Amino acid sequence: MTTTADNATPTVTGPTVRRTAWIAVALAVFASAWGGNEFTPLLVMYRETGNFGAVAVDALLFLYVVGIVPSLLISGPLSDRYGRRPLMLPAPVFAAVGSLLLALGANSIVLLSIGRVFSGIALGLSMAVGGSWITELSVRGGAGAASGARRAAMSLTAGFGIGAGVAGALAQWAPWPHVLAYVVNISLAAIALVLLLVRAPETRSPSGTPGRLVDDLKIPSAAHRRFLFVVLPVAPWVFGACASAYAIIPALMSARTAGAPIAFAALCCVLGLAAGFGIQSLGRRIDNPDGVRGVAAALTVLAIGMALAALAAHMLTIWMSLIAATVLGCGYGMAMIAGLLEVQRIAARSGRNDLAGLTAVFYSVTYLGFAIPAVLALITEFWHAVTYTHMFIFGIVAALLCLAIALYGHRRHAVAA
């Protein structure tokens, strides 16, 4: 996640706080995002030096979704009941434990799997609780809610990008490639935990007479026809594009980047994330509140990205691979902002006051895209005649099919419906 579409100013009551109080929470979010994405450029390393098959390694990329989705869906309502601190304090702990298990598990699929799940839990807590806490602290510190939202988004984005870049560089050129990158994250998480304990005041008092938790978890707007036919077709492409850009393409190019395959994977990751973040301001301008232009533009860019990825898989040249990763990153950013803006409008106009829950559902579906590398690796393992070029061509067709569904959904189910 690199952005938020919630531009509404929340009502945040309570005493004022230091203007810099939000930084402690932002560092915890940064450390969790770092821990979530540090593993990605190292996939090439585990393929080359570990005793794991391609399917197993790509499945590890997806496994942290097992931690993200439950914590994302549940921790938000829990933090509304019990406060932000009790739910956010464990995030850097989970991040550190996850990195520790990854550092110890270079040759153990079990330790790597558990470590990825712990990293996912930390990221889910940070996305659901950390973002709200940063916004509330920003408002109490004298900044606007929009500033708080930007700070939360930047904390996540910086963690994702810098974490991948530093981890890739350390694994490529520093000693102890299976350990050192994770030690950096453990240190960051420890510092973040201390700062949370001493410098981050609570902004949400525990609810005195809470209702049933199951009622808080209900999200009526998730059944809205526009959400089903316009938002869901684009959602898995968000991180499906990312996974293609910095998991599949670097793996295909590993033989052509023998001098620095891990650094090349990190470069693809950073390029994709940077392009995705940079394109989002354009995505806001393209989007129209009463239309479907943002989603249509995103799926069009994604189809182009799939075409370039097919060319990269066929040509196996570094320059085409980097271009494909960058365009796929643009598709990721466009799909993210278009989906979030649609979610905001659906929740606002439905009158059900479930924006946070609907946003969590959207993010949960976006993370399913990380399953794509494992699925494609499984296909190539069982059907050797099917190449990645063929599958990326199928991706073009799939993106255009999703575009057709979204256009149909827009015509049949207007935003205000």
Label the predicted regions.
Residues 291-337:
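C-terminal transmembrane helical hairpin of 12-TM major facilitator-type secondary transporters
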Residues 179-197, 390-409:
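Symmetry-related core transmembrane helices of the 12-TM Major Facilitator Superfamily/SLC fold
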Residues 264-288, 298-305, 369:
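Transmembrane alpha-helices of Major Facilitator/SLC transporters
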Residues 59-76, 127-131, 270-282:
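Central cavity-lining transmembrane alpha-helices of secondary-active solute carriers
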Residues 69-107:
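Conserved MFS/SLC helix-loop-helix module at the cytosolic interface between two early adjacent transmembrane helices
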Residues 144, 151-197:
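Helix-loop-helix hairpin linking two adjacent transmembrane segments in secondary transporters
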